Structure formats: structure tokens, C-alpha cells
Amino acid sequence: MKLQLIVVLLIALVIVSLVDGEMLEKRCKNRLKKCTSNSECCDKKDRGGRKLRCLTXCDERHCLTYKQCLFYPGLQKVKRLCFTYCRCTI
């Protein structure tokens, strides 16, 4: 009886850890969170229909040393904001 209970508890722990692992993998990053690729950012759109992308941004005319999930305003606006002031690369 005790052995069966232990086996059932072990199986339950394995199932919970598998489900929790899948949940962690499916989590995405919201706006302003650090990222390394577009796939890490949540598949959300703002009011203007812009999607979150993993971009290098500027802070007071200097490039940040990391990328963030930001709403992508289009190449022209990103160039104007980043390339003109601090020559960031997308």
C-alpha cells in the first residue's frame, strides 16, 4: 500500500514538472524586456498595429548595449530615432 502511494506521488511530481517546464518555455517577453531574438517577444500588437520586435534602442542618444522587445514603428522611424542620433543597428 505504501509503495503504491509513493509510486503515485512520484508520477504526479513528474507530470507537474513536465507541465511547469512547458509553461516556462511558452512564456514570452513583454515590452521593454531584454531579448536576443524576435521569437522571444510576445506576439502582441499596439493600437497602431505594430508588433513587438527585438530591437536595439537608444537611451539619451546612446545605443543600449542590449536589445529590448519594442513595438516596431517601421524602418524609417527606427532609422530616424537610432541611426541619426547614435548609429544603432537593428
UniProtKB/Swiss-Prot annotation:
It is found in: Secreted; Nematocyst. It comes from the Eukaryota. GO terms for molecular function: potassium channel regulator activity; toxin activity. Neurotoxin. Blocks voltage-gated potassium channel (Kv). In vivo, induces a rapid increase in swimming speed on zebrafish larvae, as well as death which occurs between 2 and 18 hours later. This is U-metritoxin-Msn2a. Keywords: Cleavage on pair of basic residues, Disulfide bond, Ion channel impairing toxin, Nematocyst, Neurotoxin, Potassium channel impairing toxin, Secreted, Signal, Toxin, Voltage-gated potassium channel impairing toxin. Residues 22-27, 77-90 form a propeptide. Contains 4 disulfide bonds. One of its GO terms (cellular component) is nematocyst. Residues 1-21 form the signal peptide.
